[in-house]
Amino acid sequence: MEVNILAFIATALFIIIPTAFLLILYVKTASQSDS
C-alpha cells in the first residue's frame, strides 16, 4: 500500500505541477492581452 500511495503522489505531482505552470502562463498572457 505504501508503494502505491507514493506512486499515486508522484503521479499527481507530475500532472499537477506542469498543469499549474501552464495555467500561470495562460493567466499572464491573458492579462497582458486584456491590458
Curated annotation (Swiss-Prot):
InterPro entries referenced in this protein's UniProt entry, alphabetically = PSII_PsbM (IPR007826), PSII_PsbM_sf (IPR037269)
Keyword field? Chloroplast, Membrane, Photosynthesis, Photosystem II, Plastid, Reaction center, Thylakoid, Transmembrane, Transmembrane helix
Membrane-topology descriptor: Single-pass membrane protein
Kindly indicate whether the keyword Signal belongs to this entry.
no
One record GO biological process: photosynthesis, light reaction
The signal peptide annotation in the UniProt record is none
Where is this chain's protein located in or outside the cell? Answer: Plastid, Chloroplast thylakoid membrane
Q: Which GO terms describe its cellular component?
A: chloroplast thylakoid membrane; photosystem II
* Transmembrane domains' residue ranges: 5-25
Q: Which residues form a coiled coil?
A: none
Name the major location: plastid
What family, per the record?
Belongs to the PsbM family.
UniProt subunit comment = PSII is composed of 1 copy each of membrane proteins PsbA, PsbB, PsbC, PsbD, PsbE, PsbF, PsbH, PsbI, PsbJ, PsbK, PsbL, PsbM, PsbT, PsbX, PsbY, PsbZ, Psb30/Ycf12, at least 3 peripheral proteins of the oxygen-evolving complex and a large number of cofactors. It forms dimeric complexes.
Annotated function: One of the components of the core complex of photosystem II (PSII). PSII is a light-driven water:plastoquinone oxidoreductase that uses light energy to abstract electrons from H(2)O, generating O(2) and a proton gradient subsequently used for ATP formation. It consists of a core antenna complex that captures photons, and an electron transfer chain that converts photonic excitation into a charge separation. This subunit is found at the monomer-monomer interface.
Q: What is this protein called?
A: Photosystem II reaction center protein M
Source species: Chara vulgaris (Common stonewort)
